[in-house]
């Protein structure tokens, strides 16, 4: 199943020109000759978050950008949304970490009843908006995710795990914003 979208400035401003147009005069960036065509192979929503795998992303000849995605359930690799905090569970965490490749991944391990966790949440969301080269995840350490929390060695909440290339490279325990920021910057530069 493939969904082809061609977007242009004209199609966004004029209802007479639908965004599904494949007319090259309407699917290019005005004055540049560059195409805005994107091909999608599939997607899914997990816990209300749009999650995808990019199989191939490269700049094509003439400026065309092509991205393809596969159904992201089961053992398929997944990718979190950049610039947002993505909530994960025991089933979605490792596939997202694997899909991140060499990008740093920061995991906020929290509980609903934890006061310091609630205090850190807005700061953590701002970090996600600021550091677009880092994947920000959060894991509710409830009964359902207990096995993953144990696997990651949680002892206190909040705990922030910093991962890179499928391995934990840093940890910050407690609501220590400055230490978290240092750990993120260290992971980005390594």
Swiss-Prot record:
Q: Which organism is it from?
A: Spinacia oleracea
Return the annotated site residues (Contributes to redox potential value).
115-116
Cellular compartment(s):
Plastid, Chloroplast
Q: Which CDD domains match?
A: TRX_family
Q: Name it.
A: Thioredoxin F-type, chloroplastic
Q: In this UniProt entry, which residues are annotated as the site Deprotonates C-terminal active site Cys?
A: 108
Q: How is this protein annotated for GO cellular component?
A: chloroplast; cytosol
What is the recorded function of this protein according to its Swiss-Prot or TrEMBL entry?
Participates in various redox reactions through the reversible oxidation of the active center dithiol to a disulfide. The F form is known to activate a number of enzymes of the photosynthetic carbon cycle.
Which cysteine residues pair off into disulfide bonds? 114-117
Domain Thioredoxin: where?
A: 78-189
Q: Which InterPro entries match?
A: Thioredoxin-like_sf, Thioredoxin_CS, Thioredoxin_domain
> What are the boundaries of the transit peptide?
1-77
Active-site positions, per UniProt? 114 (nucleophile), 117 (nucleophile)
Q: Name one GO molecular function term.
A: protein-disulfide reductase activity
User: What do we know about how this protein assembles, alone or with others?
Assistant: Forms a complex with heterodimeric ferredoxin-thioredoxin reductase (FTR) and ferredoxin.
The family note in this entry says: Belongs to the thioredoxin family. Plant F-type subfamily.
Q: Name one Pfam family in it.
A: Thioredoxin
Chain intervals with Polar residues compositional bias:
7-30
Q: Which UniProt keywords apply?
A: Chloroplast, Disulfide bond, Electron transport, Plastid, Redox-active center, Transit peptide, Transport
